[in-house]
Amino acid sequence: MKTGIVTTLIALCLPVSVFATTLRLSTDVDLLVLDGKKVSSSLLRGADSIELDNGPHQLVFRVEKTIHLSNSEERLYISPPLVVSFNTQLINQVNFRLPRLENEREANHFDAAPRLELLDGDATPIPVKLDILAITSTAKAIDYEVEVERYNKSAKRASLPQFATMMADDSTLLSGVSELDAIPPQSQVLTEQRLKYWFKLADPQTRNTFLQWAEKQPSS
C-alpha cells in the first residue's frame, strides 16, 4: 500500500505543473489553512516554500515566536489565528514580514491590533486584507476548515467567498473514482486526495524529503 501511494504521487507530479508564484514560508508562522484547505503539516514540515498559481489566495495562520519576559525568562508566544487574503497576479514570490515581537508588550499589542506585510520578490508590499479569525467552536480540537468556511460566508474583511465551499462537500473529491474500481473506504480516499493536493504544492526539495520519509514507514 505504501509503495503504491508513493508511486502514484510521483506519477501525478510528472510533469510538474507550472506555477507562477512561490510562497516563502517563515519559521515564525504556523500555516493552518490555505485557500480553504487544511494544511498537511506532515508534508510541509521543514518546507521552505509552497508553489501557488496566479490569482486570489487566502492564508490562515498563527504567529509563534519566543519572546522575553520582564524577569529575564522566555515563553512561546502564539497569536490568535489570523486570516490574510491577497492576489498573486503578476507576482513571482511572496514573503512574510512580521513586526518586531520580542517582549510581552509587543505581543499584547500584536494581539490587539495584528499587522504584517507580504512582500514580493523585489521587497515591494503586496496589497493584503488582514483579519482575526474568531473561533466559534468550543471543542478542544478546532476544525479550522469549518471555521474558515464559516468566516468566508460571513462577508468579513478578509473573506473570499470562492473558498467558502471548497471542502464543504467531500464527495467532490471522490469524483475521479471509476465505477469499475474497487472503492476503498471514503476516509482513505479523502486522506490520499488531500495528500496528493499538498504534494503538488510542495517545492521539489520538500517532495523528495517526504518521499524518503514515506519509504521508511512500515507497510500497512
Curated annotation (Swiss-Prot):
Top-level lineage group: Bacteria
Signal sequence coordinates: 1-20
UniProt keyword annotations, A-Z: Signal
InterPro entries in UniProt: UPF0319
Pfam families referenced in this protein's UniProt entry, alphabetically: DUF2057 (PF09829)
Protein family membership: Belongs to the UPF0319 family.
Organism from which the protein derives: Shigella flexneri serotype 5b (strain 8401)
Keyword Signal applies: yes
Keyword Signal applies: yes
Identification of the protein by name: UPF0319 protein YccT
